[in-house]
């Protein structure tokens, strides 16, 4: 009777205990599964970004080393397959890689879907400009650091001497001797040219008067030919040495890339963003100055030798770009020289006297117009000499003074190629710096895409004929779908992870 009192034969306690244990075990399993899934989701997010970062590990090395641009060359590459390859490898745990075993943390890549790919030529090359500006900032810092390093590590030049007190002082006699020896070297080369140079000069003189047969039937081309060769023969000693290379522009970004509506309006001159004409453009012009060649520093292994001239003018011919830039420099020098003539009272009065003496007809304002014409011709003649000095690797100050001014008003009657400039060429801007001034006046859109043209031409000639900079990726956004392994459920779980990578 006592046994029946303490033991309930209905079994309600056993059922309640079983239900309680089942609920507790289910909660434990649910918690474990949730933790498992959360860890897999976090791991899949990391794998997505790691795969995209690994993809950009195949960046275009020549583009980075030569021009400081970080991009992925998409040509000959299936981006989805490349991303899937990196994702598959990163899905494996270290244990499965070493022992070829499965793991509860192993993920399986289901598919890859690329949502967006951005190229360096997109959005009016805005990303290209950003990378250039960043590159110039670091380049200036590096240049300054190198200057400090060189100045601290360089040996003392011979022009320094030690006095009785043990301190260094300048020996000006040694400085003069050093300069004299250098000048003597150049003077000997000038006064004793080689026979080959003299032969080339004679040949150039004999060939300069010849007219190509294909120009005889075209009047406009013939006139252009006469003007071009006449200006070249005055500005340079050997016009035949000016590069006549041409290139095919049909595959260049300036032709193939589509501009935005804002870019098209800006390119046509309808709109102008003042913020892009200050710091950003200064950085960009400095980048061109430090990266590309010109007439005095021609490019090697390139479709065109004169890169800066091409960026300014945009013709597919080297000589046309060169002549155009020379004309622009002449116009710039003319304006600067005219400003100096107006500021110099003696020269201005000389022009005024000649204008007054030549004014025969009593027409109001005729004397003033004659005076302005004389000053303009005077400034233009001096500008021709200035441009010739620049092409001879001399410096020319932006605003000249009486010491650097060559022509008097009476010299205009005998002005010719034989006229010798009085400018010593030690102070002022070089030819390449004048080109940089011309760059600052160019349209931004044209400047950006012509620079991309030159980069593409150079890489095509040096590394890969099929290279197209319009296929260079700087940003990518992709979705990667993963199959998550289960622990306590038979239901397959699919998780989609979205990742992106871009230049920062």
Regions found by a protein language model. Name each.
Residues 1-2, 127:
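Coil-to-alpha-helix initiation sites in intrinsically disordered, low-complexity, charged segments
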């Amino acid at each position: 009777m006592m046994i029946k009192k303490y033991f309930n034969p209905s079994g309600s306690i056993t059922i309640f205990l079983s239900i309680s244990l089942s609920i507790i075990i289910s909660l434990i399993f649910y918690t474990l599964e949730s933790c498992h899934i959360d860890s897999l989701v976090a791991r899949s997010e990391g794998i997505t970004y790691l795969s995209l970062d690994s993809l950009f590990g195949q960046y275009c090395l020549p583009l980075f080393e030569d021009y400081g641009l970080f991009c992925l060359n998409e040509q000959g590459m299936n981006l989805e397959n490349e991303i899937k390859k990196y994702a598959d490898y990163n899905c494996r745990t270290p244990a499965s890689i070493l022992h070829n075993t499965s793991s509860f943390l192993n993920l399986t890549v289901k598919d890859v879907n690329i949502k967006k790919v951005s190229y360096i030529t997109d959005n009016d090359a805005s990303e290209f400009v950003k990378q250039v500006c960043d590159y110039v900032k670091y380049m200036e810092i590096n240049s300054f650091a190198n200057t400090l390093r060189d100045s601290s590590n360089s040996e003392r030049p011979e022009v320094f001497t030690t006095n009785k007190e043990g301190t260094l002082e300048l020996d000006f006699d040694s400085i003069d001797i050093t300069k004299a020896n250098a000048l003597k070297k150049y003077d000997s080369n000038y006064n004793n040219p080689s026979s080959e140079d003299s032969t080339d000069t004679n040949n150039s003189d004999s060939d300069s008067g010849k007219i190509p047969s294909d120009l005889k039937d075209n009047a406009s081309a013939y006139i252009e030919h006469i003007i071009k060769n006449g200006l070249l023969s005055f500005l340079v000693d050997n016009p035949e040495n000016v590069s006549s290379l041409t290139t095919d522009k049909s595959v260049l970004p300036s032709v193939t890339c589509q501009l935005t509506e804002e870019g098209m309006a800006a390119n046509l001159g309808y709109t102008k963003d003042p913020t892009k004409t200050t710091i950003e453009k200064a950085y960009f012009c400095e980048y061109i100055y430090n990266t590309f060649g010109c007439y005095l520093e021609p490019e090697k292994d390139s479709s065109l030798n004169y890169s800066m001239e091409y960026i300014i003018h945009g013709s597919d011919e080297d000589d046309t770009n060169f002549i155009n830039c020379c004309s622009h420099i002449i116009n710039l020098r003319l304006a600067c020289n005219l400003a100096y003539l107006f500021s110099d009272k003696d020269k201005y009065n000389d022009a005024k006297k000649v204008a007054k003496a030549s004014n025969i007809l009593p027409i109001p304002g005729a004397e003033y117009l004659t005076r302005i014409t004389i000053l303009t011709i005077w400034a233009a003649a001096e500008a021709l000499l200035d441009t010739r000095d620049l092409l001879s690797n001399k410096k020319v100050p932006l605003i000249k003074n009486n010491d650097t001014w060559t022509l008097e008003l009476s010299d205009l009657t005998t002005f010719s190629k034989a006229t010798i400039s009085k400018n010593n060429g030690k102070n002022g801007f070089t030819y390449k710096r004048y080109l940089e001034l011309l760059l600052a006046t160019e349209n931004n859109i044209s400047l950006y895409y012509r620079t991309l043209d030159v980069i593409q031409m150079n890489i095509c000639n040096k590394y890969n004929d099929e290279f197209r900079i319009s296929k260079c990726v700087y940003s990518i956004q992709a979705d990667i779908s993963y199959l998550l392994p289960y622990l306590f459920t038979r239901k397959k779980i699919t998780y989609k992870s979205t990742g992106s990578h871009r230049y920062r």
